[in-house]
UniProtKB/Swiss-Prot annotation:
PROSITE patterns: SOYBEAN_KUNITZ (PS00283). Keywords: Protease inhibitor, Serine protease inhibitor. One of its GO terms (molecular function) is serine-type endopeptidase inhibitor activity. Exhibits Kunitz trypsin protease inhibitor activity. This is Kunitz-type trypsin inhibitor 1. InterPro entries: Kunitz_inhibitor_STI-like_sf, Prot_inh_Kunz-lg. SUPFAM superfamilies: STI-like.
Amino acid sequence: LVLDVDGNPLEVGSEYYIGRAVGFYVVERFSEVDRGDPLSSDVQIDSGLSAYCRSDGFWGVPPSSFRIEKTEGFPNAYKIAYSPPTTSSQQQRYPDLHSGLNLVGLTDDSARVVL
């Protein structure tokens, strides 16, 4: 269950804003032991940024490859985590040249548009 800043459950079809708690781009932190749970419904995320995207903030993310996790120590605070694909054809990595971390949403597979 994901809650908004007022402690109410998120509602399908409603708009929510993610506070600026991260940098300008999203990276993958790979874990062999915790791959997370796939989402059961579509989630659309508007990054509001276009500095690193050709399509004015649109991200392509393979289906069921990210999840929302509760953060520790902050009430109603969450983070978006990436679950790497499980098939060998999807396990290509695209490292960021500056940080060496893997970028989220870069794949040659069919993608779901995230707004």
